[in-house]
Amino acid sequence: MKFAVIVLPGSNCDIDMYHAVKDELGHEVEYVWHEETSLDGFDGVLIPGGFSYGDYLRCGAIARFANIMPAVKQAAAEGKPVLGVCNGFQILQELGLLPGAMRRNKDLKFICRPVELIVQNDETLFTASYEKGESITIPVAHGEGNFYCDDETLATLKENNQIAFTYGSNINGSVSDIAGVVNEKGNVLGMMPHPERAVDELLGSADGLKLFQSIVKNWRETHVTTA
């Protein structure tokens, strides 16, 4: 399986994402600069965290107009896995690939520490290696991770089982403790915590590795045939 790591001006987690796939997962991965226009040949798309374009206007607002974004939307439409982490999640919201919006954290402070997440849905291609209700530890690093949506959207997310992860303890004011959601098809995931920073016990947790393993497992089941 071959992954693309989208690199935007201000990305700062692209190296971590590359390391998770290449060194820990053992799969192909390439950096794709924001000025590119094609993602042909890639099986999965990863949009890392950071402060794309300085987070001017609002987080992800300018990144949505990058040359590469139509190709990201096309990959999602084709059913390829698309993962957006932190700023990547905000970008997916700006693209209209995921619902909701991000507000400033409730205490108006930047939060950077490991947090407990609860797996709410183990039936997506991103979470199949977890168990529903499983408690995992993944670090966060954000100032605007307060997930917000209206009551109607929240009801739809719950009805469609689109809430992938919630916080064990609500750290930022997110509606219903939401830390990550998928689209209706289940092939696009946005999450504020950083799984790519939790792929080795030396870093304090390897719980994030299961997410990447889930992606590969699903891809193998749907693309690899045995004689």
From Swiss-Prot:
CDD domains: GATase1_FGAR_AT (cd01740). Part of the phosphoribosylformylglycinamidine synthase complex involved in the purines biosynthetic pathway. Catalyzes the ATP-dependent conversion of formylglycinamide ribonucleotide (FGAR) and glutamine to yield formylglycinamidine ribonucleotide (FGAM) and glutamate. The FGAM synthase complex is composed of three subunits. PurQ produces an ammonia molecule by converting glutamine to glutamate. PurL transfers the ammonia molecule to FGAR to form FGAM in an ATP-dependent manner. It holds the Pfam family GATase_5. GO terms for molecular function: ATP binding; glutaminase activity; phosphoribosylformylglycinamidine synthase activity. Pathway: Purine metabolism; IMP biosynthesis via de novo pathway; 5-amino-1-(5-phospho-D-ribosyl)imidazole from N(2)-formyl-N(1)-(5-phospho-D-ribosyl)glycinamide: step 1/2. This is Phosphoribosylformylglycinamidine synthase subunit PurQ. Its EC number is 6.3.5.3, 3.5.1.2. The keyword Ligase applies. NCBIfam families: FGAM_synth_I, PRK03619.1. Residues 3-225 form the Glutamine amidotransferase type-1 domain. It comes from the Bacteria. Gene3D superfamilies: 3.40.50.880. The active site is at C86 (nucleophile), H194, E196.
